[in-house]
Amino acid sequence: MSKGKQVKALPTPDLNEPMSLELVAEAIRAKRTQEGLDTQTAALLCGVSAVTLNKIENGSKGVRFESVLKIMLSLGIKLTILPWEKNNA
């Protein structure tokens, strides 16, 4: 039985940085690799195509937000929206 290509775990990005497309892409790729998942396997587990996962991990524009959320939830990445202060105008 031959082993497939081993996935090299990438470090977790600085999650205290302001939210950006690049940060989300880095976080998804880091979590996937830390779980030892190749792109094909992760895409299958997340219910998206490998092409979509690659686009998201590379920070490509034009991907559906629903796909990003599906991947984040499947990989256990939490997205939190904090309450904001209301302006009294």
Language-model segment annotations:
Residues M1-L23, K86-A89:
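N-terminal flexible/basic segments that precede or flank functional cores
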Residues E22, R32-T33:
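Short amphipathic helical patch at the helix-1/turn junction of helix-turn-helix
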Residues E26, E35-D38, V63:
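Residue-level signal for the short linker/turn that defines the boundary of a DNA-recognition helix
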Residues G36-N54:
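Short alpha-helical DNA-recognition segment
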Residues E66-L82:
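DNA major-groove recognition helix of helix-turn-helix/homeodomain DNA-binding modules
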